[in-house]
C-alpha cells in the first residue's frame, strides 16, 4: 500500500459522523448498497497540480477500476478542475490469518481524522463539527490517502484543513420561493 498526502480543494465533504453518507435502504441500488454497508465518509478531492495525477499514475494507480474513470473532470473553479472521489467506509472489517495460522480482524473503516491546520502546525487541533462547522465547497486541505490492491483501491485516511470555506446550504431563490407554501 502506498500512502500519499496532497494539497487538495474539497467539494461535497461528508467526512464527519454528523454528515456522512449513510445511504438509503429504500433508495436506488447505490443508496441501498451504501446503507447495507453502514455508510461511508466521502469527499471529492480536487488536485491542485497536474504532477499529482502524474505521480499517482506512475506509481500504479488504476485509472479505470471496473471501467469507471478514477480521475474525473469536474468544476474548473476548484484546483485544476480534476478530482478523485476519496472515501472510507463507516465500518470496513476484513478477516486475515497471521503467520501462526491464527485468524484476526482489522477494521479499515471509521471516521477519518480531521485536523484544523488553519492556525498553523504548532496550533493544530482536531476539527470540531459543532464548533468549527461542516466543510464548504472550496475548502483547502492536506488530504492523506492510500492505494491498495495494486492501485485498484483508494482509501481516505486523514484531512488537514488549511483554509476553511464555511458550508452554506443554499438559500432558496425567488423562483424556488414561488413554489413554497406555508
Would you name each region that the model predicts?
Residues 1-106:
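OB-fold ssDNA-binding interfaces and closely related basic DNA-contact patches used
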Residues 146-169:
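OB-fold/S1-family single-stranded nucleic acid-binding modules
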Residues 111, 115-153:
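Exposed beta-sheet edge/beta-hairpin loop segments within beta-rich domains
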Residues 1-6, 165-182:
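Acidic, gly/ser/pro-rich intrinsically disordered tails
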Residues 91-96, 112-118, 164:
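Short regulatory "switch" loops immediately downstream of catalytic or recognition motifs
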Residues 69-71, 136, 166-168:
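Glycine-rich loops and low-complexity Gly/Arg-rich segments
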Amino acid at each position: 500500500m502506498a500512502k500519499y498526502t496532497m494539497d487538495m480543494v474539497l467539494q461535497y465533504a461528508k467526512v464527519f459522523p454528523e454528515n456522512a453518507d449513510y445511504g438509503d435502504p429504500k433508495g436506488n441500488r447505490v443508496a441501498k448498497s451504501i446503507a447495507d454497508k453502514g455508510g461511508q465518509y466521502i469527499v471529492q478531492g480536487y488536485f491542485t497540480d497536474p504532477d499529482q495525477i502524474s505521480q499517482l499514475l506512475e506509481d500504479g494507480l488504476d485509472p479505470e477500476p471496473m471501467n469507471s474513470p478514477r480521475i474525473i473532470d469536474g468544476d474548473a473553479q476548484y484546483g485544476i478542475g480534476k478530482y478523485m472521489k476519496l472515501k472510507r467506509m463507516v465500518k470496513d472489517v476484513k478477516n486475515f490469518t497471521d503467520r501462526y495460522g491464527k485468524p484476526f480482524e482489522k477494521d479499515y473503516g471509521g471516521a477519518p481524522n480531521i485536523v484544523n491546520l488553519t492556525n498553523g502546525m504548532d496550533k493544530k487541533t482536531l476539527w470540531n463539527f459543532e464548533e468549527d462547522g461542516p466543510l464548504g465547497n472550496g475548502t483547502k486541505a492536506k488530504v492523506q490517502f492510500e492505494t491498495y490492491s495494486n492501485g485498484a483501491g483508494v482509501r481516505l485516511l486523514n484531512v488537514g484543513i488549511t483554509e476553511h470555506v464555511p458550508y452554506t446550504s443554499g438559500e432558496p431563490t425567488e423562483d424556488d420561493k414561488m413554489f413554497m407554501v406555508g
